[in-house]
Amino acid sequence: MDETSIINENTDVFEKKITLIERNLQEITINDKEIIRKIIRKRNLKIYWGTAITGKPHIGYFLPILKIKDFVEAECEVTILFADIHGFLDNLKAPIELIENRYHYYEKIIKIMLMSVGCDINKIRFVKGSDYQKNSDYVFDLYKLCSYTTERDCKRAGSDVVKQRDNVLLSSLIYPNMQALDEEYLKVDAQFGGEDQRKIFMHAKTFLPKLGYKKRIHLMNPMMPGLNSDKMSSSDELSKIDLLDTEQQINKKINKCFCEEGNLQSGVLHVFEFVIFHYYTSISINKKSYTSIEDVKKDFEMKLIHPKDLKLACSNYINKMVTPIRNEMLKDIDMIKKAYNN
């Protein structure tokens, strides 16, 4: 192979990696695109995604899971953080006495989801937050970070993620500082999360340098709206389709979604846009093929797709995605009961 061919091949590999890393993202924070390129020219990007151990994961988790698959295919060094301590810091969404059981639940279901989309989990590092967040160096850095941040700083940083209340708990204020420190202690170049994490990401960019640590890259995927609300949330049963929901429960939830003929403000269309079209390259609704959400929306707005047909197709595709995950999880009923007391 001559020198020109080698250069062209390296350029092709570089561009493929950049495309995989950046596609389907909602936002990459300012100036970070160029930093990504500088790193990729030298070595593989180190990136982490953290998930707080709270309510049961839902179909909205397919968004980060599919993006993680992209990162792995781009040869990034990917770390997944199971943030168990964060789970109870956030207004005790996960009771302390259940946190260990819920960690095992999350670890299993996230790995099953990754395998269900064809991601090689052997190329991912899985970390439990409490395995390093109780170490003396981490805790002392947390004290130092708290000396630089005010109540207002931390309350603002967590306002889109941490549950808000009139008398804010100190634990909720610690949450953003710990998430900032995780970037340093996981030794990564970048943190990936939903766009609801933006204020925490900016908090990290502002305050980590005060401890002498570098600013990290931040990548954000869009947040999936709830079935009948602004955000699909693990802690809001009415907003989500749980990954353990039965076929009948899934059908019922989708059938109850607002879906007026010709009206694009529908939770059913959101499921197609944020989940189904990220999973499938082509779908069929009433025997017609579609390769983009834009085409589905166009036909629905023109009343060429009836709400009943839209809901039926939505239910069918979600059930195909969820059924193998549910079946695998139900092999360990005892683990589920211990995690969620039911």
From Swiss-Prot:
Q: What is its EC number?
A: 6.1.1.1
Q: Which residues bind L-tyrosine?
A: Y48, Y175, Q179, D182, Q197
What's an example Gene Ontology biological process for this entry? tyrosyl-tRNA aminoacylation
Residue numbers covered by motif 'KMSKS' region: 231-235
Q: Which keywords belong to this entry?
A: Aminoacyl-tRNA synthetase, ATP-binding, Cytoplasm, Ligase, Nucleotide-binding, Protein biosynthesis
Q: What class of enzyme is it?
A: ligase
One GO cellular component term, please give it.
Answer: cytoplasm
User: For this UniProt entry, what is the primary localization, expressed as one broad class?
Assistant: cytoplasm
Q: What is this protein called?
A: Probable tyrosine--tRNA ligase, cytoplasmic
